[in-house]
Amino acid sequence: MKYSELGKTGIKVSRIGFGVLTVGGSQLNLPVAEGAAVLRYAFEKGISFLDTAQYYQTYPYIREALKGGRFEPVIASKCLDYTYRDMEFAIEEARKELDRDIIDIFLMHEVRNDPDLELRAGAWECLNDYKAKGIVKAIGVSTHHTDVAHKVVDIPECDILFPL
């Protein structure tokens, strides 16, 4: 497996990541033990980057896969919410459900257009605060939209643009 630094974050990840959505309830709906076994297999093959999100409801799979401390993948999670309070809840939920003090990467999820980005100012403020506290290592935006991508690359605090 080849590994690279993720932008200027200092975070090293495998060039192949694992989208955890697939094992959860909205897709394969695997039992937690079975989904965790799939994740451990990916780790054994060298995959060190997991992509998840609050609404995927896949934290139990990841937590189970990490029991025993043998693997320490980089975990990126995302949240659809707009307000500071809701983003804070999402980060704290991830910390609790993943049994981690620090979240590697946290993103605003599926930002749809410029007004959507602006409406999430509270969520963005929260991400910046949690990064400043050292609770989140890197922050950014996930999007399907090129206009959002063009705007996000000019935001100095944005560590990661995650085009979907």
Each PLM stretch: what is its role?
Residues 1-73:
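N-terminal binding-site loop/beta-alpha segment at the start of enzyme catalytic domains
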Residues 54-56, 68-89, 109-112:
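Structural motif corresponding to the early beta-alpha repeats
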Residues 26-27, 40, 84-164:
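Glycine/proline-rich, positively charged
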Residues 20-22, 43, 79, 107-112:
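Short, histidine-centered active-site or binding-site loop motifs used for metal coordination
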Residues 5, 13-17, 48-49, 72-76, ...:
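Structural preference for beta-strand elements that scaffold enzyme active sites
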Residues 56-60, 82, 146-148:
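Short alpha-helical
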